[in-house]
């Protein structure tokens, strides 16, 4: 847990999220830092833990967890909202903010405790539907991204290098 109460994970050469494709020493989708879906899961874990504490009549501990969850939400909104594009950054690592449009941000609006509301949530859903939704599933990158690979096939190198680069 970082000073801003968000979770930081990973290190150079290591993949810790579901987008874990690696070819030799090459990390195809580097996501070191604060991944959007990890923050959404963290926020929900804190809120659920607080609810369990309340059910067990541990009000002081529940208040502490809810306070931590509010800090997470505040930090998340300050660091992850990409106002220029109307959706969430995929990963934040210090001053670097990865603006790749990926489906990972759906966790922030689809779990029981959402991190976005109103216009922001609507914007995320609208853009994901327009750019990532297909009749057979969600793309992991939009077709207009220069890294987009629409077909998963070929030898091991081609498959691994295309794995999380758009194929639905």
What residues fall within each predicted segment?
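Extended glycan-interaction surfaces of carbohydrate-active proteins
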Residues: 1-35, 71-168
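Short, charged, amphipathic alpha-helical segments
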Residues: 63-67
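Flexible, glycine/charged-enriched surface loops at secondary-structure junctions
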Residues: 60-61, 138
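Well-ordered alpha-helical scaffold segments within catalytic/enzyme domains
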Residues: 38-59, 107-118
